[in-house]
Amino acid sequence: LNPGLPESRAYVANIVADITSRYDIDGIHFDDYFYPYPVKNETFDDKETYLRHNTSKLSLDDWRRDNVNKVIKQINDTIKTIKPWVAFGVSPFGVWRNKSDDERGSNTRAGITNYDILYADVAKWIDSGWIDYVVPQIYWASGNKAADFDELYKWWANYSNAKSQVFVGHAIFKVNSGSKEWNNPEEMPSQIDKVRAND
């Protein structure tokens, strides 16, 4: 689905409305969503949609972020109109922005970020109250040079600052995967202990 198309956003909102109305649920959770991760020698071709629906004359990047913001707000509004107690949360990529690109960002050097590459302004969603919780996918080890787990779990906890709940997404699938940092039997228990101590 192309987030730039109003009918795509309405389609998703209608599905969420149906689920929320018909079932006794505690929440709706989105995981890996919206614009695709970059693939070498491939582009997401939404030029025609951009030209047709960019009525605010935004740059392509800002327009894409605005589309995703509209999806998130529309889903939240849909849920809260039907059942205000049902939680809405998202599990985004683990880095919102690098500090080198935005002083509010984390002290990381990630090649992919939510804001710049995936067009997901998770900080805005938190600030606007559009999500009840966030589960950042912090899939790096402590001490990783590009994206240190310790830096990131603290950044998300501090940024959210009670505006939304934070539950860390751990990379359990990487344990014993062959890399030195993930073959360390203490890495995952240590990450869990750090997050619990920061609660």
Locate predicted features.
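Aromatic- and acidic-residue-enriched carbohydrate-binding clefts of CAZyme catalytic domains
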Residues: L1-N2, P38-R65
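Generic structural signal for well-ordered alpha-helices
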Residues: V16-T20, N69-D77, V122-A123, D150-A157, ...
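Active-site-adjacent "subsite" loops/lids of carbohydrate-active enzymes
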Residues: L1-D18, R22, D116-A120
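Second-shell loop/turn segments in exported
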Residues: N2-P6, L58-R65, A141-S142, G178-E181
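Conserved, mostly hydrophobic/aromatic
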Residues: V12, I19, I28-D31, I79, ...
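Aromatic- and acid-rich polysaccharide-binding/catalytic face
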Residues: D26, D31, D46-L58, N107-T108, ...
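Substrate-binding cleft of secreted/luminal carbohydrate-active enzymes
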Residues: Y119-K145, W156-D199
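Aromatic-lined carbohydrate-recognition surfaces of secreted/lumenal glycan-active proteins
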Residues: V16, H29-Y33, D62-N114, S164-V175
